[in-house]
Amino acid sequence: IPGLTAALSGGAVLGAPLAHDFCVISLSDRLTPWEIIEKRLACAAMGDFCVAIYNPSSKGRPDYLQRAVRILLQNGKSEETVCGIVRNIGRERQQSEIITLRELENKQVDMFTTVYIGNKTTKNIESKMVTPRGYRTV
């Protein structure tokens, strides 16, 4: 949908992963030095933000998602954190999957993939990734 960011469109495919506070981080170091991206990932983990990740991998940087997962784990995210991936958001052959942060470390993704990392309250509810807002227990 024009004007709607991939983070929100892909989030709707997965369920409701980006409720409450969240951030969007690109892993592309073409315009942003990797050291700054590392700091953003660490701060997002320490703040227990839900995170949408753009540009998770490319031919020139095939291991950036794995590096990002390690940074998140080192800074407070649990291996059991609920995560999601959506490929080809809003296009033909759209695919989605809900996994854990531990499983994400070994996933092969590309530039057509948006990755979602939950927070401590994010759950897999009937194959939907849901981050409750805290008004009522789900």
PLM feature segments, named:
Residues 46-138:
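A contiguous loop/helix-start segment that scaffolds small-molecule binding in enzyme catalytic cores
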Residues 1-47:
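Class I SAM-dependent methyltransferase SAM-binding "motif I" and its flanking Rossmann-like core
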